[in-house]
Amino acid sequence: MECCVCNKIFSSPRGLHIHQSRIHQVGFGTRGGCEAAVHAVRTFVQSDACEVLLKLDVQNAFNSVNRDTLLNEIKMTVPEIYNFLLQCYHCPSKLMHKNNEILSAVGCQQGDPLGPAIFSLTINSIIHSLNSKLNVWYLDDGTLGGDSQTVLADLIQIKNKFKDIGLELNFNKCELYISDNVDSSSASQIIQSFNNIAPSIKNISKDSLHLLGAPIFNEAIPPLLSKSISKFSDYSDRLLKISSHSALFILKFCLLIPKFTYLLRCCPIWKYPHLLRPLDLLLKSQIESILNIRFSEQAWTQATLPIRYGGLGTRKISSVALPAFLASIHSTSDLAGNILKASPATNCEIACLVEASNAWLAGPSQNFPSRPKIQRAWDNIASVSTLNSLLDTAIGRDRARLLASSRPESGQWLHAYPSPNTGTFIDPGTLRIAAGLRLGVAVCADHNCASCGSEVDSLGHHGLACSSGAGRLSRHSALNDILRRALVSAGVPAALEPQIVRNDGKRPDGMSLIPWKMGRALVWDATCADTVAASYVPSTSRRAGAAADTRERQKVAKYSCLGAQYEFVAFGVETLENQYFAP
């Protein structure tokens, strides 16, 4: 209910007043607010306008703000929701602790979807009255910058005015940074002045200045990466104690890149490839342990591509760092510019933008994406360039494998959620072989096939096309069962091995029991071609899906005797490709 009210008000003309506060308050209703604040502060501290930077923290802010002030501010700013919030906040809230009932008469209610918005509106007038050249807040965390006298005066004003509405600064968590442009004697006086107002304020240096979890100066990046390597190593050791599929799934979607995305977008980590290399090597070692395979250099390069380009989706930090940073700057540049233009302090570009753009142009691509605000647009260009370089050096079976793996749907199994209950769990042996075939790495030792006696190399391709192997029949049955179940789930009953034959006496694989199109029943015959079979490599190394296309044309020709009585469809798949349909 509250979410609906909030969205309705914020999208109304009255919401314009609320959105105007985003210049100083980026803590609610602001897409990319944290990133914009970090980029703006990094730009500001590198300008001559920055003498000091003050980080403020409010103690227990949401639970302490005066409710009368909160409601009065709401009544003046957004009267449309005043009556609704009055019902929520005019009486003390009941908090339960075991069997005890505690009445809470101050602060926003715990779990209130409107909590961040109404808290920000409560302190909005105070924030706008400040005179510092840099003035940006994320809810109760404020950052002020400029000359020391103005920032100090704002600190005194905040301390006094916040006290009037029930808020108190937590000086133990407040931090003061003094620019290198300030001489040592002046710096000592500045520190003393701030200590008189905030006795326990911390004086920090470049290597410890962080904003909203992101380092501001380059000096703070190496310690952060060292800490991240240690933490990821601890996580990685635990992954080896669970199933391979679960471990790979967690690694791709929960660890490393997902945890690093915010930092990659906020910080110029791409400038330190020598520091990123240990993380990439740790990732490589971990995936080798999970899948029980060993990567060649080409296989590792392919594995770190997105799934849609033939990889495993386990991205390297060094590959994602620059696209993520460039996308963040372009997507938040307007907001960051508004934060900086709120004062006459800066008329410069966002810090590191030119350097990052030059680094991009110095790479394999000389073009910028048409949609620079989207990270995938940058990543697509880099990934396509990497895939093309792999294709340029690959020949024969390797090229056919790469083309097949980079086709749509061929890597959908890598998105499967590891759940035995839903039938999407992949056992360790199957996962190892599937990944090995996709990447072209050894999956077995050289030996002779137990079924036909043929030589089998370490890549294991023989098992995909062995005419004596048991897997060929089960694979064909599984294909037809999938088709039949798909039709039945769509309300089209179907049967396998119908009572119709072609001229040589052979039957198709299946048929619908009701008309499919223009009064005719659907008849299908499935086939699976080996992408890397010697007879198909000349065509599959030039065009993905060529083997399935050839087999489908053959099927259509064989069943042409059915004439117009049935709607015949050939269903062709490849061992390393997705499905094709030929009517």
Task: For the regions a language model picked out, list residue spans one by one.
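Active-site-proximal segment of RNA-dependent polymerases
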Residues: 26-56, 60-64, 281, 306
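Basic, alpha-helical interaction scaffolds
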Residues: 123, 194-270, 328-335, 339-340
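Conserved polymerase palm-domain catalytic core
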Residues: 43, 49-155, 172, 178-180
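Active-site metal-binding core of divalent-cation-utilizing nuclease and nuclease-like domains
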Residues: 425-458, 482-532, 538, 547-553, ...
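Extended C-terminal regions of large enzymes
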Residues: 279, 295-435
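Short cysteine-rich clusters marking metal-coordination/redox-active sites
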Residues: 3-6, 449-450, 466
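Short, conserved micro-motifs composed of acidic
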Residues: 149-151, 156, 160, 168-207
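C-terminal recognition-helix end and immediately following basic linker
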Residues: 1-25
